Design a protein with these regions (language model features):
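Alpha-helical tetratricopeptide repeat
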Residues: 2-164
């Protein structure tokens, strides 16, 4: 599960940067978010963490700064710290489906399968066309013994990912 979670974390991170989306109305904050995302995708976690902490001091209401810091914590195996940052990201932007998916990954890694399932359900509610949440939810359903639900989610995920 952890190997798949790392791969999905990288995919989710990469999906933000190429589109040039910063998710910020402040140009300087947007630039910081983009730079941090690039560092995370390059697996330069310590440098990214330093920049992220500095940016949070300057822009404490930027949801995606907490998202990226949570991603860094997750990549470094610091699941509880990651969950706290994803909680803050969601508090600031309840429509950020990527934060729900990554928080769900952390919860699943900490054996909170029901909490993970709730997060994946919310991510799917927010972005039903995103196959990654279906894939992760399938893994949790499999762990919970719901083979039919897991197969259904994998089918949906494959259809969505193949249609892009």
């Amino acid at each position: 599960m952890k190997k798949h979670a790392l791969i999905l974390s990288l995919i989710l991170g990469l999906s933000i940067i190429p589109a040039g989306i910063s998710y910020s109305t402040d140009a300087d904050a947007g630039k910081a978010i983009t730079e941090i995302g690039i560092l995370v995708n390059a697996q330069k976690y310590q440098i990214a963490m330093t920049k992220c902490n500095a940016a949070i001091q300057k822009y404490p209401n930027e949801s995606f700064l907490y998202y990226w810091r949570g991603s860094i914590h997750n990549s470094m195996g610091e699941k509880q710290a990651a969950i706290e940052d994803f909680n803050k990201s969601i508090e600031l932007d309840p429509a950020n489906e990527k934060a729900y998916v990554l928080r769900g990954i952390c919860k699943a890694d900490l054996e909170d399968k029901e909490g993970a399932l709730e997060d994946y359900n919310k991510a799917i509610e927010l972005a039903p066309e995103d196959g990654s949440a279906y894939s992760m939810r399938a893994m949790v359903k499999l762990d919970l013994g719901d083979m039919d639900g897991a197969n259904s989610d994998l089918d949906t995920s494959n259809k969505l990912m193949n249609s892009k």
